[in-house]
Each structure stands twice: as C-alpha cells, then as structure tokens.
Design a protein with these regions (language model features):
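Short beta-strand/loop segment at the start of cytosolic alpha/beta domains
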Residues: 1-14
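Residue-identity detector for threonine
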Residues: 3-5, 20, 71, 87, ...
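Amphipathic alpha-helical interaction surfaces in cytosolic regulatory modules
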Residues: 12-95
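Cys/His-clustered metal-coordination modules, chiefly Zn-binding fingers
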Residues: 84-157
Length: 157
C-alpha cells in the first residue's frame, strides 16, 4: 500500500510516494494524470517487489511516451537497488538525488543522508563521513560505492 501526496510549484508538480509498491498498487489510480513536468520524491518508499517493479515501469514508460518530463529525488535503498538491477527502471527520468545509508562507528546508529547525483560525481562517489546526531562520532557510508552508485556511474552522472 502506498500514499501519494501532490504539490504544485512554478508549473512543476512534486509527487511524494510513501510505502510499499507491490501487486496491490495501481500507480495510475494512486498518482493520477501527470502534468508536463513532475518530480517524484521517493524517500519514503520502503519496499518494491517484482510486480511493483512491473507496475512502476509500465506507469513511467507511459509517462515518457506522453512526453512527460520527470525526475526522481531522494531515492532510498529499495529504489537504488532496482536502478542498479534494471537498466530502464528510470524510464528516461533523471535521478536528481539519492538517499544513502550511513552507520555510526561508535553507537552503530543507522542513518540516512541525501546526496545530489551531480555532487557524487565531484567526489568520485566516495562519501565523507557525517556526524552522528546521537553520539557525535563519525558515521560512515554503509555500502560499497562502486556497487551502490553503479547506475549513476553507468550514466556518467
């Protein structure tokens, strides 16, 4: 089940999707018609299964076919995983930013931070540590950069 929140600013729609995308989700019904430009905020997507992937590709492929320009922002690990596994998962949309996992070296708190795709290229996909809000120690990126950002590296983003 998902929840969708829509907002319009300067002619660009923002659509925030939260929850699990699976066989029970009808993206056309949940999201509805799209304007000419849309930013899809993915941060709160918690899971996507194989039938959810099919629904996603069907929906965004149709949007691309109708000349709708769309971007994806705050892509969380479940979406990043699909972007890495399925070449056309973005259906021609541009990934603006990625939500990345960090783990504190001291207290082992799991954190997420958002990084712009263009900034990742500037640092060669190597993220500096961030400060843990719980204990102030260093939190390190908790994955292999070449694997987690493979879809961006392939695109040259």
């Amino acid at each position: 089940m998902i929840t969708v929140t829509r907002e319009q600013k300067n002619g660009v729609a923002s659509i925030k999707i939260a929850g699990t995308i699976d066989e029970h989700v009808d993206l056309q019904k949940e999201i509805g018609p799209l304007p000419a430009q849309v930013n899809v905020i993915c941060r709160e997507i918690s899971q996507i299964n194989s039938l959810g992937v099919k629904a996603w590709i069907d929906f965004f492929s149709q949007a691309a076919h109708h000349q709708i320009e769309f971007t994806f922002s705050d892509c969380p690990p479940p979406i990043v995983e699909q972007l890495n596994y399925i070449t056309n998962f973005s259906c021609g949309g541009h990934v603006v930013s990625v939500s990345v996992p960090f783990t504190c070296e001291n207290c082992h708190k799991e954190l997420r931070g958002t990084v712009k795709s263009e900034d990742l290229k500037k640092v060669f996909y190597k993220l500096p540590p961030i400060k843990c809000p719980k204990c102030s120690a260093k939190a390190l990126f908790d994955d292999v950069p070449e694997e987690y950002f493979a879809f961006l590296i392939r695109q040259g983003a």
